[in-house]
Swiss-Prot record:
Its EC number is 4.1.1.23. This is Orotidine 5'-phosphate decarboxylase. The gene is pyrF. It holds the Pfam family OMPdecase. NCBIfam families: pyrF_sub2. It is an enzyme of class 4 (lyase). It catalyses: orotidine 5'-phosphate + H(+) = UMP + CO2. Disulfide bonds: none annotated. SMART domains: OMPdecase (SM00934).
């Protein structure tokens, strides 16, 4: 039986001793042409894979390239799976009715599908339904925005809004009747830049995998993230993109070293 996204990530976390999610942000301005961008992105993926629990392509940078970007995304997904890496697409999709269903079908079950997708809940909880259904049907996962890593998130996510979303995520997880140590198909995005809130959200969503963006370039430190994890270092993924892919320009060796260093920093902070 094919493992679910949550099972695959947890297995890799334990077997490879890594809680690192490597983000891929292929920014055209960093390269002389699309061919160089393509090769460097695939090289960084391969170099960092031994130290990653999953890979997170940022869809915006692939979409900005047009058709070559979608072709590259297919290559990235295929290469990641060959390397044994689950693929978490960072698209922050969200809409109503048939549009939400189309997003879910395309990104969780279509030609360019990943194993998981970030989802925006701010049109209402009912809009999550197509994404939840698609994730469950395909053995995938969604990661719902709860408290994002950017400083101005407080404009909309303060005053109890994030906590209300967290409670809904926990409810959706409870529907799956999971056993001890298992994680649901509905996870949460909680910025690593909010270390003081991590333990609260961990307690509110005990069965949710937490995606923690902001490690590295956005200023979050591995030593501050322990509150997001369960005993043994499971239940969360700390994400770094620029800090790995562009650790020293386009130097693939530097990307490898950065991924290794971040993996070790996370393990050291968690004592695992």
């Amino acid at each position: 039986m094919t493992p679910t996204f949550a099972q695959a990530v947890t297995e890799r976390t334990l077997s490879r001793r890594t809680r690192l999610c490597v983000g891929l942000d292929p920014r055209l301005g960093e390269y002389r042409d699309v061919a160089q961008l393509r090769q460097n992105t695939l090289d960084v993926l391969e170099a960092s894979a031994p130290y990653a629990a999953c890979v997170k392509p940022q869809l915006a940078f692939f979409e900005a390239l047009g058709l070559p970007g979608f072709t590259l995304l297919e290559e990235v997904c295929a290469a990641a799976r060959t390397l044994g890496l689950p693929v978490l697409l960072d698209g922050k999709r969200g809409d109503i009715g048939t549009t939400a269903a189309a997003y879910a079908q395309g990104w969780l079950g279509g030609t360019h599908a990943g194993d998981a997708l970030t989802v925006n809940p701010f049109l209402g909880f009912q809009t999550l339904t197509p994404f939840v259904q698609a994730a469950r049907e395909n053995g995938g996962a969604i990661f719902v925005l709860v408290k994002t890593s950017n400083p101005d998130q407080q404009d909309l996510q303060g005053q109890g809004v994030s906590e209300r979303i967290a409670v809904e995520i926990a409810r959706l997880g409870d529907e799956e009747g999971l056993g001890d140590g298992d994680y649901a198909s509905v996870g949460a995005v909680v910025g690593a830049t909010h270390p003081g809130d991590l333990a609260t959200f961990r307690a509110l969503m005990p069965k949710a995998l937490l995606l923690l963006p902001g490690l590295g370039a956005q200023g979050a430190q591995a030593r501050d993230l322990a509150g997001a994890f369960h005993a043994g270092g499971t239940g969360a993924l700390a994400s770094a993109s620029r800090a790995v892919q562009y650790a020293r320009g386009l130097d693939v060796g530097a990307a490898r070293e950065a991924a290794l260093a971040l993996r070790d920093e996370l393990n050291g902070a968690l004592g695992v």
